[in-house]
Structures are given as C-alpha cells and as structure tokens.
C-alpha cells in the first residue's frame, strides 16, 4: 500500500479541512496516510474506522506563510520539513502540502533532490478549456527568471506528464509568446523556440487565448509569467461567478432562467473550480511533490491526494530522465 506524507498543519485553516480531505480520499482509495503535525490536534479528528490507514508523525512547529523560504532548512521540527524527510528517506512515495509553497519547493529541491540532468524543477498546473479537456501550463511560480535551456527542459517534462498522467497519446506543446509568428518573443523565448524545434511535439509559439481553447495540450512559460497567468485566471473566474450571481438577483426572470440552467452552471463550476484539480505537481524532483493552495478545501485536499497516488503509481520520472538524456550536451 502506497504511503503519502501529508503536511497536516500547512493550510491557512489549520488541520481540520486537511484531515477531512484525507478521510474523503480514504473512502475511495486505499493508501497509508502519514499525517505530520501536532498529534494532540489531529488524532481526535480521525474516526476509529480509519485508524488502520493512518500513521502519525509528531511535529512541534508550523512553518508560517509569513516566513522566508530560505529559512525552511533551519526549521527541522516543522511539519513541512519532516514530511519532506519522509519522502527523502523512502518512507513515503509522495508528499501533499497546502503550506508555504516556497518552503515546499526549496526543501523538495534541496532534500529530495533533482532528477538527473534537470537544471530546475517547475510547478505545473491544469487549466480548463472550452473543449472539456485540460491544458497543462508550466512553470507557474518556481522560477521567475529562466534561461532558454530551462524552458526547453520544462517542455520535455510537460510532454512526459501529458503522456504518463493525462494520457494524451501525442501531446501538442506550445511556447507562450506575444504572437504565433516565429520571430515573436524576447531573446530568451526566441532561443527556447530554436531548442524546442527539436521536439516532434512542438507546434511553435502560442498566444494566451490558446490556453483555454483546447488547441494545445502543454504550454511553456517562465514562472514569472506563469504565476501572473494563474492568479489572473483565478481572479477572472471568481469575478465572472460574482457577476452572474449579482445579475441573477436583479431580475425574477433571470432567477427562473438560472434555475432552469442549474445543471449548466454546475458543469461550468466543475470546469473552473480549483478544488477539482487539488494541487500542482513539482516536476523535476526525484519523487512526487504536490503543492496545494493554502486555502484548500477538503475537496481540494482529496483531489491533491488522488493526484499524488496517480503520480506515484506512474513511471513519469524515469520517462523524464530518459527523454532528457537524448539532449545532454
């Protein structure tokens, strides 16, 4: 049975939503949940029926959101440090954390280590599209400054993820730019374009609107652009939801129409709801690391665990290393 390390203290709302998400996941999948945190707080939240699936690791500290990621290595008693160590030592196959993302990334990179030939790990996230499929975007925050070589490696990692985890047989990989023409972009993306042209999966430059139209399976960008893209998308989705709700309240006819379209709205919510995705994998490290939002609901935690299980059961890291080995200079 696969063991998953879970940072039980990492979220913004304490251990309750995280533990609820773990229990919801255990209703559907068998795995060993290794809960890292204050045992006095988390153990009472576990019903007796689930006790055989849960292991506890005591942690006396919580790495708060306000702390600097550079201090993570010093905080050896923190829940995130101990959870990462469980993966590093081979006691767990994956880690899920809704805590400090910078601390999670730095600890995963320094303690678990990078895959062979990977210069920099990248955070990948799934974006909804109009074709009822997902687009994988990376990097969305791990690296604000990238060289062309880094973007090229992201393309290989993203393509591997699309094949192994998303089950896309022949994924299309695009480079996010300010136009589709080969000449568009800055110096880094132009150089990356030349390097990515070696990949059979590469279709060239893509524009921002193609993230959501389903025409591309994997989109590559640096973490600065990717994080702005991610936060903007979250903001737009939230704003549209609020606009629809306010508009419905203003008219009885709109209210009736909304009731008739309840199923449509529910399907739309599922498409754009972050909770449906759960978390973002950190690609390029030796084991599975899933980074979840600090405000993760139980549903998001459950789906993050499902992501971790799918990753742990796959052969993706071997595939990434094999693909990168073909391009080592």
UniProtKB/Swiss-Prot annotation:
Protein's UniProt keywords contain Cytoplasm: yes
Q: Which UniProt keywords apply?
A: Cytoplasm, Lipid biosynthesis, Lipid metabolism, Phospholipid biosynthesis, Phospholipid metabolism, Transferase
What EC numbers are recorded for this enzyme? 2.3.1.274
Mention one GO biological process in which this protein takes part, according to its record. phospholipid biosynthetic process
Q: Where in the cell is it found?
A: Cytoplasm
Question: Which InterPro entries does UniProt cross-reference here?
Answer: FA_synthesis, Phospholipid_synth_PlsX-like
Pathway, per Swiss-Prot/TrEMBL? Lipid metabolism; phospholipid metabolism
Gene Ontology MF term list: phosphate:acyl-[acyl carrier protein] acyltransferase activity
Primary subcellular site in the record, as a coarse category: cytoplasm
Q: Please list the reactions this protein catalyses.
A: a fatty acyl-[ACP] + phosphate = an acyl phosphate + holo-[ACP]
Read off the Pfam families from this record. FA_synthesis
Q: What class of enzyme is it?
A: transferase
* One cellular-component annotation, GO: cytoplasm
List the NCBIfam families. plsX
Q: What does this protein do?
A: Catalyzes the reversible formation of acyl-phosphate (acyl-PO(4)) from acyl-[acyl-carrier-protein] (acyl-ACP). This enzyme utilizes acyl-ACP as fatty acyl donor, but not acyl-CoA.
Matches recorded under PANTHER family: FATTY ACID/PHOSPHOLIPID SYNTHESIS PROTEIN PLSX (PTHR30100), PHOSPHATE ACYLTRANSFERASE (PTHR30100:SF1)
Similarity remark = Belongs to the PlsX family.
Assembly notes = Homodimer. Probably interacts with PlsY.
Report what the protein is called. Phosphate acyltransferase
Q: Which gene encodes it?
A: plsX
């Amino acid at each position: 049975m696969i063991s998953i390390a879970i940072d039980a203290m990492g979220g913004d709302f304490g251990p309750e939503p995280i533990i609820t998400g773990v229990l919801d996941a255990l209703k559907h999948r068998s795995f060993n949940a290794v809960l890292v945190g204050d045992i006095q707080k988390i153990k009472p939240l576990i019903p007796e029926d689930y006790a055989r699936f849960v292991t506890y690791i005591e942690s006396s500290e919580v790495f708060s959101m306000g702390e600097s990621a550079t201090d993570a290595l010093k905080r050896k008693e923190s829940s995130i440090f101990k959870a990462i160590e469980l993966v590093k030592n081979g006691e767990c196959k994956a880690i899920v954390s809704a805590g400090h993302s910078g601390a999670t990334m730095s600890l995963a990179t320094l303690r678990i280590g990078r895959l062979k030939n990977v210069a920099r790990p990248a955070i990948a996230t799934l974006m909804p599209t109009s074709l009822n499929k997902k687009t994988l975007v990376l990097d969305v925050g791990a690296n604000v400054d990238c060289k062309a070589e880094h973007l090229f490696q992201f393309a290989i990692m993203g393509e591997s993820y699309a094949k192994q985890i998303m089950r896309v047989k022949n994924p299309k990989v695009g480079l996010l730019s300010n136009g589709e023409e080969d000449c568009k972009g800055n110096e880094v993306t132009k150089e990356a374009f030349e390097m990515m042209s070696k990949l059979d999966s590469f279709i060239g430059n893509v524009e921002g609107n193609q993230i959501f139209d389903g025409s591309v399976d994997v989109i590559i960008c640096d973490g600065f652009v990717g994080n702005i893209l991610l936060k903007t998308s979250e903001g737009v989705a939230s704003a549209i939801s609020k606009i629809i709700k306010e508009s419905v309240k203003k008219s009885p006819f709109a209210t009736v129409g909304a009731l008739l379209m309840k199923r449509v709205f529910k399907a739309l919510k599922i498409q754009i709801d972050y909770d449906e995705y759960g978390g973002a994998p950190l690609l390029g490290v030796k084991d599975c690391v899933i980074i979840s939002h600090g405000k993760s609901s139980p549903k998001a935690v459950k789906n993050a665990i499902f992501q971790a299980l799918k990753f742990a059961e796959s052969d993706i890291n071997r595939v990434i290393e094999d693909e990168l080995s073909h391009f080592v200079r």
